[in-house]
Amino acid sequence: MALRMWASSTANALKLSSSVSKSHLSPFSFSRCFSTVLEGLKYANSHEWVKHEGSVATIGITAHAQDHLGEVVFVELPEDNTSVSKEKSFGAVESVKATSEILSPISGEIIEVNKKLTESPGLINSSPYEDGWMIKVKPSSPAELESLMGPKEYTKFCEEEDAAH
């Protein structure tokens, strides 16, 4: 952890950043805080991600968000078959640093909740885009997905937000 913090502060001091060229076909890029941003996902400015496949949208918090939260120790999630509304809270993440609300980037009906997070909340830290997903939603307004940021926009957003702090 100390090495990670040192690397992050050094990169910030040197204003390092890297991006992946399209010719490498890598599915992710790194912002200057070394957080992973995946291609093929949409991102909210509240640091949630959405993976839309067919009629289902999977939602979780970004690597950037979990980096800032630190070690996640508890997750509060809603029940299946309830509704979420865009930009409204659907749960909370408690870390060793703080408790943060999770805002839904889209509206819809929750069709599945990641029950693994109850027993293993650290999955959000170790695998925010795979095992650490939070809910699966049937979107009620697919057009809401278009208002979210793509990977490049989200990376720039995070860099600007970090520079302001």
From Swiss-Prot:
S-nitrosylated and/or glutathionylated at unknown positions in response to nitric oxide. Residues 56-138 form the Lipoyl-binding domain. Highly expressed in leaves, lower expression in green veins, petioles, and stems, and detected in roots. Binds 1 lipoyl cofactor covalently. Its cofactor is (R)-lipoate. The modification N6-lipoyllysine is found at K97. Inhibited by harpin, S-nitrosoglutathione (GSNO), nitric oxide, N-ethylmaleimide and 5,5'-dithiobis-(2-nitrobenzoic acid). Its main location: mitochondrion. GO terms for biological process: glycine decarboxylation via glycine cleavage system. It comes from the Eukaryota. Disulfide bonds: none annotated. The modification Phosphoserine is found at S140. One of its GO terms (cellular component) is nucleus. It is found in: Mitochondrion. Residues 1-34 form a transit peptide. Keywords: Glutathionylation, Lipoyl, Mitochondrion, Phosphoprotein, S-nitrosylation, Transit peptide. Induction: Up-regulated by light. The glycine cleavage system is composed of four proteins: P, T, L and H. The glycine decarboxylase (GDC) or glycine cleavage system catalyzes the degradation of glycine. The H protein shuttles the methylamine group of glycine from the P protein to the T protein. PANTHER family: GLYCINE CLEAVAGE SYSTEM H PROTEIN, GLYCINE CLEAVAGE SYSTEM H PROTEIN 1, MITOCHONDRIAL-RELATED. Belongs to the GcvH family. This is Glycine cleavage system H protein 1, mitochondrial. The lineage of its organism: Eukaryota, Viridiplantae, Streptophyta, Embryophyta, Tracheophyta.
